[in-house]
Amino acid sequence: MKLPSLIAALVLAAFVFAGCKRPEAPAGSATEIIIGEFASLTGGTASFGQSSHKGTKMAIDELNASGGVLGKKIKLITEDDQSKAGEPATVVRKLISRDRIVALLGEVASSRSLEAAPIAQEARVPMISPASTNPKVTEVGDYIFRICFIDPFQGTVLAKFAQSKGWTRAAILTDVKQDYSVGLSQFFKEFFTRHGGTIVSEQSYSSGDKDFKAQLTSIKAPNPQAILVSGYYTEAGLIARQARQLGINIPLLGGDGWDSPSLVEVAGEAMAGNFFSNHFSTEDQSPIIQDFIKKYRAKYNEEPDAMGALGYDSAMILADAIKRAGTTESGKLRDAIAATKDYQGVTGRITLDEKRNASKPAVILTIKDGRFRYVETVAP
């Protein structure tokens, strides 16, 4: 390669993969609005990313079928971060610099949203996470939003539920590699102990582990009445199965990270009688939820989960904000997203607070006959 060509190539590479300043020229064309999405379509938590993407794609297809937004069709460009650390930063830089997106949707996992959020914030590209519940995500800056509840609320919901069952002695098993799990355990412990409960054992593991017998044996000894397993479905199913093998027959509790068909596929009957908090229930008979389920089934020939519903809501809230802003100019679009109030989504009525977090209810689900069954709704 000749020297001028080499220099040009290096300059281009630096532009795409380094500072990632947003191009000054307007994104898209006169007939389209370009939105980026990053999701874990492959890898360890692919179930989350695939579901979220399906919901997002369904919303975009519906919007385009009805004429688009501001008279323009929406073009969705999706990048797979492969459930890997490091990939979110790479793909988000590409979406901003190469594709010149006007807004960004993603991720489900808090650790991956935390990796991407500083890049979106620096470029002043509004980012909406459908399901990252760790509080630190929106603390990155004023261009970062979420439409799900946060872990301080979710941890409180689980602790209140445990105490409503009369359980005063609990154990905690945390995935130390996931910000989500660490935060959820912390907030559960704070509320549970502040209101008279005792944490009799705290154990940890790392994402990808397969053998949890040592931790479970340590948990069994002080006789807890329930165990919080605050990580993702990828390990929770194995933990449930191994707990039952060790004769631990008390209820396990989890957060929205349990929401995947793979949970029951891995654990089988060992998951029966356990509980987790989530964003919606397919057993809710409200028309908006049943209509969403009907459309999702027709499009994908499967039941939606909460990640699919949150993906749908995130795209619809973004479209609503673009309409209210009357433009895709980043500052005005940011302000319109921040002003979201009483938006009736599939996962509830959504209002964004001053910290750009959604105030909305949670549901408690239990596992019975291999299905997620509704128990109760808990308001903020």
Feature annotation, model-predicted:
Residues 298-308, 319-372:
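Segments of small-molecule ligand-sensing domains
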Residues 88, 147-170, 182-184, 211-213, ...:
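Hydrophobic alpha-helical segments within soluble ligand-binding/sensing domains
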Residues 32-57, 79-86, 108-109, 173-182, ...:
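Extracytoplasmic "Venus flytrap"
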Residues 240-312, 326, 366-379:
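Extracellular/periplasmic periplasmic-binding protein-like sensory domains
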Residues 1-34, 65, 379-380:
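Short, low-complexity disordered leader/linker segments with a strong preference
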Residues 185-277:
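Extracellular/periplasmic bilobed ligand-binding domains
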